[in-house]
C-alpha cells in the first residue's frame, strides 16, 4: 500500500532532469538566433574600439565645436602653466569692518561726466 522509501528520491531526480532539459530547450533557440545574427552581420562585435573611421578621428586629437571651446581649452592650458602667486600681504581678510575714513580717496576722472553738466 505504501510506496517504498527509495521511490521518492527517484521522482525528485526525474523532476530535476525535466527542468534541466527544459532549460536546454530554451537556450537552443537563443543560440540559433545568435547564429542568424552573426551570419547577417559578420563584423558586428569584433572590434572593441569601434569602427576604423572612429579610431582615426580619435587619433587625430580633440576637435572643438567652435572658437569659444577652443579659447576655453587654451585658457585652461595657460592657467595650468602659470605658477601660483604668493598671498597678497595687503589683502583684507575680513578681520575688521571698513569705515569710510579707512577707505582710500576716490581719484577724479580726467574727462568730465556728461551727466554732471
Curated annotation (Swiss-Prot):
Q: Where in the cell is it found?
A: Cytoplasm
> Where is it predominantly found?
cytoplasm
State the source organism's domain of life: Eukaryota
Modification sites for Phosphoserine: 67
Cite a GO CC annotation. Answer: cytoplasm
Name the keywords, alphabetized. Cell cycle, Cell division, Cytoplasm, Mitosis, Phosphoprotein, Protein phosphatase inhibitor
Compositional bias annotation for Basic and acidic residues? 10-37
Please give a single GO biological process term from the UniProt record. regulation of insulin secretion
Q: What does this protein do?
A: Protein phosphatase inhibitor that specifically inhibits protein phosphatase 2A (PP2A) during mitosis. When phosphorylated at Ser-67 during mitosis, specifically interacts with PPP2R2D (PR55-delta) and inhibits its activity, leading to inactivation of PP2A, an essential condition to keep cyclin-B1-CDK1 activity high during M phase.
Name this protein carries in UniProt: Alpha-endosulfine
> From what organism does this protein derive?
Gallus gallus
Amino acid at each position: 500500500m505504501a510506496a517504498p522509501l527509495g521511490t521518492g528520491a527517484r521522482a525528485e531526480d526525474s523532476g530535476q532532469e525535466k527542468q534541466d532539459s527544459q532549460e536546454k530547450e530554451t537556450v537552443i533557440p537563443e543560440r540559433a538566433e545568435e547564429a542568424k545574427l552573426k551570419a547577417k552581420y559578420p563584423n558586428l562585435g569584433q572590434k572593441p574600439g569601434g569602427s576604423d573611421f572612429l579610431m582615426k578621428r580619435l587619433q587625430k586629437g580633440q576637435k572643438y565645436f567652435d572658437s569659444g571651446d577652443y579659447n576655453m581649452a587654451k585658457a585652461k592650458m595657460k592657467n595650468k602653466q602659470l605658477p601660483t602667486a604668493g598671498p597678497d600681504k595687503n589683502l583684507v581678510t575680513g578681520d575688521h569692518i571698513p569705515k569710510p575714513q579707512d577707505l582710500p580717496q576716490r581719484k577724479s576722472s580726467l574727462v568730465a561726466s556728461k551727466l554732471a553738466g
